[in-house]
Amino acid sequence: MNLVPIAWRNFCYRALSSFLTTLSLALGVALVVSVLAVYGIIREAFVRNASVGYNLVVGPEGSGLQLTLNSVYYLSQPIENLAFADYMEFFSQEERAEMVRQYGGDPELGTRSGRYHDYMAGGFVIPLALGDYYGQHRVVGTTTAFFENLRHGPDVDQPFTCREGRLFEADHPENGVFEAVLGARVAANMKIGVGDTMNPTHGDPEGKGHGQGFHVVGVLDPTGTPNDRAVFVNLEGFYLLEGHAKPIPEDAIVEPAVREADDDSPTLLTIPEREVTAILIRNGNLMYAPLLQSRIQEDVGIQAAAPIGEINRLMDAIVGPLSVALLAITLITCFVAAVGVLVAIYNSMNDRRRDIAVMRALGARRGTVTSIILLESLIIATVGGLIGWAIAHAGLVVAGGFIEERTGVQVGFFSTSQYEWLLLPFVVGLSLLAGFLPAYSAYRTDVSQNLSV
């Protein structure tokens, strides 16, 4: 005898009761799935975005986590700034001498290699200058090396590309050093695009706007990273904005930059006037990364943080205990849902005793009747679980734009957490256990007594 159609007909016969029980279970599952999915997506995104092609972030001495959140995720305020001379410590003697010639500064800086240069092994160094905003979005002053060297995507192998326009140039014939590239979310939120001019505000989203604007020359394709929420401008243009030049000490030795006679471009800041907020580092040989980090930590006023390590510590310290709380919520919610299944089926047993007695009189065994009741529990759990999963993920899709805008995380219908796939079997198992009490009641149904009713 095929018991599944019988259990399904019983489920459909009591349509209202079955619907309410299934809906209650579905809403419970939807709540749990939503919490687990958001937790899993955010955790995965934080860890994934901690590695976008570099392995160290260098900045002023202080909290490594704050440095990571500020430089990688654009979520925290900068600690302080580093002198441009600290940035030069990663370069060879020839490169340092060229910087002195190009910008102007103490000639002694160009007579030696930087103290960290030997640890680079042919890697790359990318400066970041932060502090300005465009609306609620961070303005990031950097060089063309940012887009040339960094990658994104699940395998960190996808270069930055433009949905519209192009990446900024070091010195454009028409725009000079005042070019900007917008993250995808910035362009959507601020309603600007290629050909427009954007004027950053100094130090605060509500601060005073700079008189000098940047020509928008490109809009990045969405990357699913915090870079979607940033505005990237030429570092040299960033330095030339009002209030960005550091006062030169009276005892500083500054030789002027070497300029062509017919060069009518703006005079760039000298080395003592320059500062960087953070430096992104990738060693050519990753074996040197721990050595470089240790070497930097030996110096005063500067630190090197490994973004992945900092984020993992954050997850262990905050998200770890949170996951235990989420597990407790999951267990309680699933238990309540199972109790709902038990109550619904058990309350229907009085109305079904005659039906059960008829089945027994027609030759059905006690085990057969018991199995039908358990199958009803299984149907309610399976249907409710699947509907709840679908409701939760549909909600995530609806809220996807808000989540991406706030966190830079792209959410799809099938974005799931590692614990989520264990939820449905767990709910089904609990519902089967809950079905044993009404099934036992059906097992003990007296045939003669209920047929005479």
Predicted regions mapped to residue ranges:
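A short amphipathic helical element positioned immediately N-terminal to and/or at the very start
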Residues: 3-12
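Short helix-loop junctions at transmembrane helix boundaries
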Residues: 386-426, 436-449
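Hydrophobic secondary-structure segments that place a key small or acidic residue at a functional site
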Residues: 128-129, 133-145, 153-254
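Mechanotransmission and gating elements of multispan inner-membrane complexes involved in transport
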Residues: 94, 204, 208-215, 219-323
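Short, strongly hydrophobic transmembrane alpha-helices
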Residues: 17-41
